[in-house]
């Protein structure tokens, strides 16, 4: 994007994710062929009428992001593959095929890279109702946005939170996760993981870290509060921690989420909410409309400006507010639009986004009646 660091760090983050090779795509195709064969063998051992089938689901979308007058076109497909192996084993993976296109500084047609990425590929073993063992490459369970809100169909605003790059998106290793009731009114969920160093392909790298997340869920209030911690086991061996909040009131079509994260790279928070106008009685078409908003703030850490740019972080302390509308055209299809404003010593900027998102689900086998 342009030369101003504040106006370009979001675009650099998208372009950096897009500058990937074909290695992940080749590995994903090989993995798909292998696990589908294994799934068929495992399903053949189950009684007739109880055989689960693989499922291909995911999202697709196209968006236009305008930052301080500079436009970037983004198109992506994010397939998710679920392959059950008997009653206790599950293989799951998510790929990302994304194109990020911009006009060159001197003018001309849009151009840019198209990436094929593998976000995660993991095997889950359901040991009992309270523990699931995960091995492979998985989404790092720090906070809630990366794991629960990242897909374009789920998120209410398409711009990434400013603090998202503070933690690695994926880890390579093993994870234990699960949940259990503490009482009739309180449930506890947890995740504990360890990740090994991976220095092979640029987009399959991971750090040597250990960490965990704990959440307390109150079913009566439909509210969750929790905290995350991560320790780097190499180089500076720094600690990182965060807190999260989620709430969906019983009587209102409202979703509230918030996160705080702190590390040597920076710190900050975001709070967002989305309200579906499904209770409107005067004009039925308004029931398909969702109103969303977010406020957030980022504080620079002790790393250099070049290191911050490489991670996709803002180059200076930044405040941002954003307002958006999502209209659900039909089941599985929505149109989005939003406007935001950034405030920073590096320069203020307007943020516009419009686009459309689609979700799909396809069984990869015959479903028994």
Question: Which functions belong to the PLM regions below?
Answer:
Residues 1-24:
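N-terminal secretory signal peptides that target proteins for export/translocation
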Residues 65-73, 98-101, 105, 113, ...:
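Solvent-exposed loop/turn segments connecting transmembrane beta-strands
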Residues 87-91, 130-133, 183-188, 220-225, ...:
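Repeated loop/turn-to-beta-strand initiation elements of outer-membrane beta-barrel proteins
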Residues 50-51, 57, 88, 215-313, ...:
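Detector for outer-membrane/organellar transmembrane beta-barrel domains
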Residues 26-40:
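Bacterial N-terminal signal peptides
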Residues 46-56, 69-197, 208, 215-222, ...:
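Outer membrane beta-barrel
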Residues 176, 348-369:
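Outer-membrane beta-barrel "beta-signal"
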Residues 40-71, 281-289, 361-369:
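Outer-membrane beta-barrel biogenesis signature
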